């Protein structure tokens, strides 16, 4: 029953994120791929031209939420993460593309967290890094607890999140997010 609540929470957050995120009408072709590389013990995932990431260990693609462009992954310990990439100028709050780097990341956090706080969730910034253009924050409530890293590089946005990770401490979740972003 507990896993059903977690799965429902994942679905709810994905739907809510996708309803908040408006990527505009102009279609952009992307190339999506990746694979597990046993010799390096990493799982690579990319959405070209928007971003790529190397995940430590073996991760299986689990679910994909197309309207949020969010790929979920699950590892052998049942830890669930999500990854989304996109252009910074396609977000509703940045249509003119004037927000860049850390200013964009802060506006993205404000926009996203405000939306969820209005729905009864709680949000807290855990760490900010203006020189590397990222914010790590936590969203929790209604039996749901997620850690996010929002980052921006050269007009490209990454949204990494750790959803179900009961076996990881808060410090491990934060370090995981930082490691995959800063590599």
Can you name each region flagged by the protein language model?
Residues 12, 51-54, 152:
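Structural motif
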Residues 7, 39, 153-160:
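General secondary-structure edge motif
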Residues 26, 65-158:
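Conserved polar/disulfide-associated segments of primarily extracytoplasmic proteins
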Residues 12-13, 81, 180:
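Enrichment for repetitive, rod-forming helical segments
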Residues 2-5, 106, 110, 114-118, ...:
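Polar/charged alpha-helical tracts
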Residues 3, 55, 92-93, 104, ...:
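General structural signal for secondary-structure boundaries
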Residues 18-78, 122, 142, 161-183:
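N-terminal targeting sequences that direct proteins away from the cytosol to non-cytosolic compartments
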Residues 1-20:
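Sec-dependent bacterial lipoprotein signal peptides
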């Amino acid at each position: 029953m507990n896993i059903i609540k977690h799965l429902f929470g994942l679905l709810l957050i994905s739907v809510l994120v996708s309803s908040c995120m408006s990527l505009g009408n102009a279609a952009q072709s992307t190339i999506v791929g990746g694979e597990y590389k046993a010799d390096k013990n990493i799982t690579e995932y990319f959405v070209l031209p928007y971003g790529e990431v190397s995940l430590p260990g073996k991760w299986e693609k689990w679910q994909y939420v197309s309207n949020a462009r969010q790929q979920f992954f699950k590892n052998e310990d049942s830890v669930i993460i999500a990854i989304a990439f996109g252009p910074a100028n396609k977000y509703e709050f940045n249509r003119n593309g004037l927000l860049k780097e850390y200013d964009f990341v802060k506006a993205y956090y404000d926009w996203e967290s405000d939306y969820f706080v209005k729905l009864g969730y709680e949000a807290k910034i855990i760490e900010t890094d203006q020189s590397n253009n990222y914010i790590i924050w936590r969203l929790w409530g209604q039996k749901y607890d997620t850690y996010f890293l929002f980052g921006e590089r050269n007009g490209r946005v990454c949204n990494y999140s750790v959803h179900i990770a009961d076996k990881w401490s808060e410090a491990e979740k934060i370090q995981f997010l930082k490691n995959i972003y800063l590599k």
